[in-house]
Structure formats: structure tokens, C-alpha cells
From Swiss-Prot:
Gene Ontology annotations for the cellular component aspect, listed alphabetically: cytoplasmic side of plasma membrane; ESCRT III complex; multivesicular body
Subunit-level organization: A component of the endosomal sorting required for transport complex III (ESCRT-III).
Domain of life of the source: Eukaryota
One Pfam entry name: Snf7
Keyword vocabulary terms for this entry: Cytoplasm, Endosome, Membrane
Physiological role: Required for the sorting and concentration of proteins resulting in the entry of these proteins into the invaginating vesicles of the multivesicular body (MVB). Also required for the proteolytic cleavage of the transcription factor RIM101 in response to alkaline ambient pH.
Protein's recorded name: Vacuolar-sorting protein SNF7
Biological process (GO), any one: late endosome to vacuole transport via multivesicular body sorting pathway
InterPro entries tied to this protein: Snf7_fam
Compositional bias of kind Low complexity: 178-187
Family: Belongs to the SNF7 family.
Membrane topology: Peripheral membrane protein
Amino acid sequence: MWGYFFGTSKQQKELPKKAIVDLREHIQLLNKKQAHLQTQIDQQQQLAKKSLQSGNKNNAKTYLKKKKLYESQLDKLQSQIDSLDQQLYSIENANLNLETLKAMKQGASAMKNIHKGLDLDKVDDTMDEIREQVELNQEISEAISKPLILQDELDEDELDQELELLESENLQKEHIAPVPQQQIQQPSIDLPSVPDVKLSTPELNSAQADEEDEEEDEDERALRELQAEMGL
């Protein structure tokens, strides 16, 4: 019984749309009737003028009475149209609010469904895992970018030898002779002269004298060689 008066749930959902359609159609019908009444008013006005021109005042009054009736109907009709327009605007606005609320409710339901399996602890755990993976990726990248042979493992002596070899090759290519080291000037040393003293011993024979002469010659020769080396 209540369904007969209020309709089913589906009918109630379609009621705003049906009301909007019916109101628009009825307003269009009233607008057409309004245009027809305006035409009748204009005709009665013209007929009244013609009756006056012909001198028939009674007919002119009759046309004017009809004109007044049409004008009264036109005013009532305009009031109805204004009321229907206001009602149509209210229903459309209410229906728009309803549809907006439905859309928001569906959005809230979708968000609730999405967040059903989520909580702050799970989100924090996931973010921690992401940070760990990012740090691990950075460490892996740094490890891959390092050279396979470390600088500390290189033999410094081998590097020095290779460096000398390269310098020698460059000198040969550029035809540049190595600069000789500056000869160091040795300071001059004044040595005391060896005294030329001959011991006159009666027991000294000629053989001993010859031996002393040879030793003296060797000493003088050694002294000359030393002076030559020292640049004296």
C-alpha cells in the first residue's frame, strides 16, 4: 500500500529527473499558450480600432472586453510560468546537490576500500624498506665504480723506473742532451814542501843512497799526482 503512494526505491531515484522533465514540458506548453493569448489580445485591439473608425462603438466595446479577459488570463499564465521556473530551478539545484553528494560518497567509499589494507605501521615499514634499498643501491654503485687495482698496491720503485724511462725517451725524441752536473771546485790546499835533507852518515853505503833516491822519486810522483787531481 505504501509503495502505491510513494513508489519503489527505483522510482524514488528517478523522481527528480522525471519532475524536471515534466516541469520543462509544462513550461513550454504555457509559453505556447501565452503566445496565443498575446495574439488574441493584439487582434481584439485591431478590431476595436476598426469598429471605432466605422462608428460602431458597441462592437468596439465588445472587442475591448475580450481583450481585457485575454490580458487577465495572460497575467495569470505568466504567474504560473514564473512559479514553475522557480520550482524547476530549485529541483535542478537539489538534484545537482544530490548527484554531487553521491559522487562524494562513492569517492569516500573507494578511498575506504583502498585504505582497508593499509595502516601507518605498514606504510612506515614500506618506506624503511625503500630507504634501505636506495642506500644499498648507492653502495653497490660506489663499489662498481671503484678501480680494480688500488693505488696503494702499486710498486713505487716500478713507477720511478718507468718515469725515468719516459723521461729518457722524451729527451731522445727532443734531441736534448742531459745537462752535465757542475764540476765541484775543490779548495786549494797548500801542502808543506818536503825538506830535501840528506843524512851524512859514514856508514851509509851507495846501495842505501840509491834506495833513498827511489823512495824520494815515488814520493814526489805521488805528490804531483795528488796536486794534479786537486787542480793545483
